[in-house]
C-alpha cells in the first residue's frame, strides 16, 4: 500500500504484524508525505471442492455436511473462504433437494486439503451415491457450459466424461454430476 499518510498507511503498518505475514517493510510514518508498507504472504492455491448426494430422503443435508467438513479442515495452511449452494435440475433420482455444494479454499497444500476433505466426507456421508470433484486453479470457467446444462436438465454419461479431465474425481457415485456442475458456480450467488 502507498498513500499520503492517514488511515490507509496506518492500517497497512498494523497488518504487517498479523499472523501469517512472512516479511514486511514499512516507511517511517508521518503525515503529509508519501509512505506505505509492503507485505509478503505465503502463496496459496485456490482449491474448489464440489460435492453432491450425501443425504437420504429421511436425513442429512449436503450443504450442512460440506460446511461442517470445510470448517473442520481449516487451519493455518488451509483457509476456508466460501460455501456456495448450487440449485440443479430436479432429476427424479435426486436424494432430496436438487442442490450441490462447492467449497472454496486458499491452501498451501492442495493435495492434503483434498485428502482430508475426502476422508471426512467418506466417513460422514449417508449415501452410497456421493460424488466429490476437486478443481485446483483460479478459473474454472471451462466447466461452466457443463454446469449450466446440469441446471437446465439431465445430462448424459458422455457429457460427464467430457469434463472429467478438467477435475480430480475423488468419489465417483451418481452425485459426481452435481459435484462437477457446482464448481464453476463458486461465489456466484445469483
Q: Over which residues does each language-model region extend?
A:
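Conserved mixed alpha/beta catalytic, RNA-binding, or beta-rich assembly cores of soluble enzyme
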Residues: 1-190
Amino acid at each position: 500500500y502507498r498513500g499520503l499518510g492517514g488511515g490507509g498507511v496506518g492500517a497497512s503498518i498494523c497488518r504487517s504484524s498479523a499472523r501469517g505475514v512472512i516479511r514486511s517493510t514499512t516507511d517511517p510514518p508521518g503525515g503529509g508525505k508519501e509512505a506505505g508498507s509492503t507485505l509478503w504472504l505465503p502463496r496459496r492455491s485456490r482449491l474448489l471442492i464440489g460435492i453432491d448426494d450425501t443425504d437420504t430422503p429421511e436425513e442429512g443435508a449436503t450443504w450442512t455436511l460440506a460446511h461442517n467438513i470445510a470448517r473442520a479442515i481449516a487451519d493455518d495452511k488451509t483457509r476456508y473462504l466460501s460455501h456456495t449452494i448450487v440449485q440443479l435440475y430436479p432429476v427424479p433420482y435426486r436424494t432430496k433437494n436438487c442442490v450441490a455444494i462447492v467449497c472454496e479454499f486458499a491452501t498451501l497444500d492442495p493435495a492434503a486439503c483434498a485428502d482430508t476433505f475426502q476422508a471426512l466426507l467418506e466417513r460422514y456421508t449417508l449415501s452410497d451415491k456421493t460424488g466429490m470433484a476437486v478443481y485446483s486453479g483460479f478459473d474454472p470457467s471451462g466447466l461452466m457450459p457443463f454446469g449450466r446444462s446440469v441446471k437446465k436438465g439431465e445430462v448424459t454419461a458422455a457429457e460427464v466424461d467430457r469434463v472429467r479431465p478438467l477435475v480430480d474425481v475423488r468419489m465417483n457415485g451418481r452425485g459426481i454430476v452435481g459435484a462437477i456442475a457446482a464448481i464453476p458456480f463458486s461465489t456466484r450467488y445469483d
